[in-house]
Amino acid sequence: MLKIENLCKSFRTEDVETIALNNVSFTVEDGEFVAIMGPSGCGKSTLLNILGLLDNPTSGKYFLGNHEVANLKEKERTDVRKGEIGFVFQSFNLIDELNVEENIELPLTYLNISKAERKAKVQAIMKRMAISHRAKHFPHQLSGGQQQRVAIARAVVFGPKLILADEPTGNLDSKNGAEVMHLLTELNHEGTTIVMVTHNEHDAKIAHRTIRLFDGQIVETEGNQL
């Protein structure tokens, strides 16, 4: 379970304070698929960065499972990210110098598992994502849809409990976007919790719930919590 309580985030530059999140509270149950929507600048990406332990809130609490994680030390935050959270980005964020196989294997290198086990996990997820034939290709040799498949494979290869997806179909045409959403839905049906930021109303309807932000506050929640 993921739970945030009265989460606030502000940024100060010289004498100007910008409030990105203002007393945001919600719970995401295990196995739930939640979409977060709102206009540009409403705090969606800031919220996702905090959920992914890439940033700290100014105040408020964040529980991941039974642990309060908002104010962990950096090493502890890194350990949680490596073991429990998978990230999928709009711009894919693949490493240009690594081929498909190496990109997918990267998060496994931080875990205490053998090379043989790493290879087996990579082969299995490439087969599932239908990209085995691209194993030795580099990102620039792939289409946008193929790059996002690689990014999803990298995000899930170590079996995270939570996937955070930031506009996962934003750079894709409708066909490839639909395929990516199908993959995320399959993962969710298997029990993976997903929180997805999106501007796409069609993508949001696939989620169990949609949380709408405006000026850093929740203004509406649609759908039913699991």
Regions found by a protein language model. Name each.
Residues L2-T210:
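ABC family nucleotide-binding domain
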Residues T210-G223:
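H-loop (His-switch) and adjacent beta-strand-loop-beta switch element
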